[in-house]
Each structure stands twice: as C-alpha cells, then as structure tokens.
From Swiss-Prot:
Protein name as annotated: Glutamine--fructose-6-phosphate aminotransferase [isomerizing]
Residue numbers annotated as active site: 2 (nucleophile), 604 (for fru-6p isomerization activity)
Keywords: Aminotransferase, Cytoplasm, Glutamine amidotransferase, Repeat, Transferase
Recorded name of the encoding gene: glmS
EC number(s) given by UniProt: 2.6.1.16
Function (record text): Catalyzes the first step in hexosamine metabolism, converting fructose-6P into glucosamine-6P using glutamine as a nitrogen source.
Length: 609
C-alpha cells in the first residue's frame, strides 16, 4: 500500500517529507518521490528503489520550500520504474499529484485525455488525475479538484499541489485513508499516523468523500460536493512502533484485520452484478482457447499452495477442467506432463519464491501457458508469466501470511468462475449467486472478525497443549491445512491437518483424553460425514472446537465449543473460515510469548531452493 505525506508551514518542507516517508517504510514500497512548489514552478524528483536512491537526486531541488508532497509507491499499474514513480504531473508540469489506490476507469479517461492532446509519460492509472485536474482548472484548484474527482471510479486518496497556487495542498479521500496533522503554525498530511507523530499529536482522520484544503491559514474540510463537515480532532498517544502497526500489538494482527479491505481491493473492477459475470481483462485467453484447455496445473509453496488447493477444487467444480495440484518444490522431479493445452497457474505472494519460479520455467519449457497469481507488481513471477492476476493485498510485513492467503483464495475463485463462463460449463444461476456472494464477502469478513474475543479465549486454553489436530473435508480440508501451518509456525505447537475421512487410517491412534481437535464443517453437503468423524474423536476423549456456518445447530451439538461464520455460498467459505483460524494461531502464540511477526528459522520470501 502506497504512502502519502504532505507539508505546509513554517519549516522547510523537504526534510519533513523525507522523514514522513521514512516512517511509512513499514508499509512496503518499490519507488519514492517528492514534489515541491516554489519560485513559480513545481519541482519533482522521483526514483525507483529505496529512499536512499531518492536521496541521491534531492540536490536538484531548491532549498527553502515550505510546501510539498511525497510518496512511496507499491506498484499496481505499471512496473516499478523512475517514470512510474509518484508524484505525477500534467503535460505542462503545473500540477503534481500523489495517489494511493486504484482508478478503475483510467483506460477510458486516458484515451479521452490523449485525444485532447495530453501527453502521458508513465504506465500508471495515477497519471490521469493531474491531466484531468488541469483540464478542469480555471484559476481555482479546489474547484478543479471538485470537478475532476467525480469522474474517477475506484478507491483512492490523493494530494495535489499547483504552481499557480503555491501555498495550498488539496486532498481527497475515497475509500483509502488520509490523516491531517495539526501542528503549531504548520499542517501535515499522511496516509497513516506514524508520519505525523514527530510534529504533532493532534490529528483529524478524514472521512469518506471529504475534501481538505490546506493553507498557511489552516485547514478547510468539506465534502467533494462542497458541503460543510464537522471534523473531530483527536489526540494520539501511541509510541512510534505501535503507530506503525496502526495501534495493533503486532503486524500480523493488523494484517488479519486488514482482510475486509484487502478482499474488497481484490474484487474491485472484476465483478459485474448486473450481468452476474466475472471480468478478468488481464487474462488474455479467448473463449476458444479456454475450451481447448485439457488441464490446469496449480503450483505453489506453503500458504500459497493451500490457496492453490482451494483453487483446484473450485476450477474442477465450476469450469469442469481437470486440475493437477503440486508443491512447487516437488514439481520438477516427477517429469510433469504439460503441453500447449495446459494452463500453468503459479501462486506466490512475493513473486520471488525460488521453487515456484523453477516450476514455472519447467512448465514453460514444455509449452504450457502461464498465469501468475501474485501480490507484487514487477516481481519475477509476474515478468515471466504470460498473464498476471494481481491480488492487491497490499504489503504484508509479518512473516506468517494472512491477507495474502485470503486474497489468493478470492483471486482463484474469480478465475474458476471466469473459466467456467468462458467455456460454458458453469450454470449461469450459480455464477450469479457466486458473484452476489463475492460482493458481500468483504463485509462478512468484517463480521467474522467479531469472533476475536471468543477465539482468543479458546486459543489461550489451547496454548498449553503440545499437539493440535485439524480436520475437514473438501474445501474445509484445504483451510485446515492452512490453519495447522499458521499454528505451528508462530506458536511452535505441533499441529497436523487431516482430511476427516482419513482419521481411521492412522491419525485416530493419536487422539486421547483432552487432545484438542479443530473440526471445520462449513460444507452442508458433507456435514453429516464430518459430524461422524467428530463423534469418532470425542469418543476417544478429544476436546473439539467446531467451525460451521451460522445456524448449524447439529454441528454445535457434537462440539465442546463452536464458532459460527456468516452464512454464505458454500464455495466461498474458505476466505471467511481462515480468519478465526488465523486468530486462533495468533492468540495461542501471544499466550506462549513467541515472536509473532518474526518466528524462528523462517523468512517472508523464500528465494533459495
């Protein structure tokens, strides 16, 4: 997720901007830049890479500027590069803009603006904004922004400066955070509170649809339409490290709570509720090519592999295409049978996982078409694939993956529906029901987070055990695999997941009095069979924690404790079911005093085989 900073006041702006960007580094970024207004012009410097790379060119900027904006970019549209870094300007260089979010209709706006003579220098969606504002400008920056913003479709936060009005910053929030800092003789703007803390503890959190005009005289807040609003000034007493985590004790907990937003970003621009269709313009397969596919190869490591297993079930169910699911570390050693009629799907949060890259190259050498599902624009997996389905989860700092998993699951759900629509195998009524369910999924993820207190209590009881078993069938088994991985990697409790039907084939020998068993039972057509397996474990003395859809009283009767998910289409449960499992692992780990964000012996991105 990009970082925005802005400053107007009595100090020199550039050191404040650079300090603010440094305090937002935890959000992750691939490039950075600043814009200053002074001497009747707008000055911009930006560079791919770290802030230290940007620092090497700041000598080109004039000293003494009191107004400026800055940005750290996490690439979405256009790979990391100097020209794709922010700030972006209009053709004349009068207006400079920094932006966090996604402009869904940027392609049509760009085409329109190019017809008007605007010259674009980048591949980004952001660049349409300064051109659009310039086309609306009549001598009043606020009025120009008010005219331009309603034409933008998507989620965004923007800050704008203009050489004609050098003592002004205009900012707008639309579904992406912005915070204003109120200092002594100065105003600050940022996408997150840490950037403000060295200068002020008095902040205004901008609400949805607000426009802020920052000048040396103060800040004026209205709606984009110009209606007055009543801002609330709050005092922030966080310590800097705590502030970077948004007030959460750990990045992992913060990222668990970011999942409603992350899921919404994954879905943005990819659903058409009116037609019940999924739109994946980034996948360049024609309907005829999809019909010609003989199989899909789903390959990944770790958490991404568990998301891939969900994808396997869904693609076979909805698109009727056989799917081979492999761990990337094993893929090359079995002489895989792939050809030009195979769609190879490589799933990787970082896009740099060594084993996944090696498997991708093996499949490509055998003629497969390659689709990457990743979170990082410009990553090696993204560059080497034919097509990329980005998850838009935003930077994930904790080693244990949370929001990356749930967004991968949703991205693969979209892919399964889309493939079924392209080859005609999916029932239109089911597709429509799934699209409707996906639209509600981000809000339901928020509802699922309300289980936190109850899950924490259960996790603290679990923390004293040496072994925990997870069981489930079909999609629930895929989630059980991810649940056991989360528990073992951050709490260091030995945990195993089994397909519930496999209990009699060995695992039942390990079930004795008091052993915790977490039973996932969210699939109505399999509920009776899973309940039978729950009964088998309880007969051996197991303590059973159950997870089911709301209203499932039958499952509750056979569990010692039950957690309910909001009711949804059964094929959409994995993205919700994983949330209480993540919380269970998190609170078990905190109860045991482990390093949650940086568990021993593990790394965020595994770039060696």
């Amino acid at each position: 997720m990009c970082g925005i900073v802005g400053y107007i006041g009595r100090r020199e702006a550039l050191p404040v901007l650079m300090d603010g960007l440094q305090r937002l580094e935890y959000r992750g970024y691939d490039s950075a830049g600043v814009a200053l207004v002074a001497g009747g012009r707008t000055w911009v410097e930006k560079r791919k890479g770290r802030l230290s790379d940007l620092q090497t060119v700041l000598g080109n900027l004039p000293s003494g500027c009191r107004v400026g904006i800055g940005h750290t970019r996490w690439a979405t549209h256009g790979r990391p590069s100097d020209r794709n870094a922010h700030p972006h300007t209009d053709t004349s260089g009068r207006f400079a803009v920094v932006h966090n979010g996604i402009i869904e209709n940027y392609a049509e706006l760009r085409a329109e603006l190019e017809r008007q003579g605007c010259v674009f220098r980048s591949e980004t969606d952001t660049e349409v904004i300064p051109h659009l504002i310039a086309s609306c400008y009549d001598g009043d920056l606020v009025r120009a922004v008010r005219r331009a913003v309603p034409r933008l479709r998507g989620a965004y936060a923007i800050a704008v400066v203009c050489q004609q009005e050098p003592d002004k910053i205009v900012a707008v929030r639309a579904a992406s955070p912005l915070v204003i800092g109120l200092g002594e003789g100065e105003l600050l703007l940022a996408s997150d509170i840490p950037a403000l803390l060295p200068y002020t503890r008095q902040v205004i959190v901008m609400e949805e649809g607000w426009l802020a005009e920052l000048t040396p005289e103060g800040v004026t807040l209205t709606t984009v339409a110009g209606e007055p609003v009543q801002p609330q000034v709050m005092r922030v007493d966080w310590e800097p490290g705590q502030a970077e985590r948004g007030g959460y004790a750990h990045f992992m907990l913060k990222e668990i709570h970011e999942q409603p937003r992350a899921l919404r970003d994954t879905l943005t621009g990819r659903l058409d509720a009116a037609t019940g269709l999924v739109t994946l313009s980034e996948v360049g397969l024609s309907a005829a090519e999809v019909r010609a596919l003989r199989k899909v190869a789903m390959v990944a490591c770790g958490t991404a592999a568990h998301a891939g297993l969900v994808g396997r079930y869904l693609i076979e169910r909805l698109a009727g295409i056989p799917v081979e699911w492999d761990l990337a570390s094993e893929y090359r050693y079995r002489e895989p049978l792939v050809d030009e009629h195979t769609l190879f799907v490589a799933v990787s949060q970082s896009g740099e996982t060594a084993d996944t890259l090696a498997a991708l190259r093996e499949a490509r050498s055998r003629g497969a078409r390659v689709l990457a599902v990743t979170n990082v624009v410009g990553s090696t997996v993204a560059r080497e694939a034919d097509w990329v389905l980005y998850t838009w989860a935003g930077p994930e700092i904790a080693v244990a993956s949370t929001k990356a998993y749930s967004t991968q699951v949703v991205a693969l759900t979209l892919l399964a529906i889309w493939l079924g629509q392209q080859n005609g195998r999916i029932d239109p009524a089911e597709a429509s029901a799934l699209v409707s369910g996906l639209q509600h999924l981000p809000d339901q993820a928020g509802q699922t987070l309300s289980l936190e207190a109850a899950v924490k209590e259960a996790a603290e009881a679990l923390a004293g055990h040496d072994d925990v078993f997870f069981i489930g069938r079909n999609l629930d088994y895929a989630v059980a695999l991810e649940a056991q991985l989360k528990l073992k990697e951050i709490s260091y409790i030995h945990a195993e997941a089994y397909a519930a039907g496999e209990l009699k084939h060995g695992p039942l020998a390990l079930i004795t009095d008091g052993v915790p068993v977490v039973a996932l039972n969210t699939q109505p057509d399999l509920a009776e069979k899973t309940i039978s397996n729950i009964q088998e474990t309880r007969a051996r003395g197991a303590f059973v924690l159950g997870l089911a859809q709301e209203g499932d009283e039958e499952t509750a009767r056979h569990c010692d404790r039950i957690f309910y998910l909001p009711r949804t289409h059964r094929l959409l449960t994995p993205a919700l079911a994983v949330i209480p499992m993540q919380l269970l692992a998190y609170y078990a780990a905190t109860a045991r005093g482990t390093d949650v964000d940086k568990p021993r012996n593990l790394a965020k991105s595994v770039t060696v085989e």
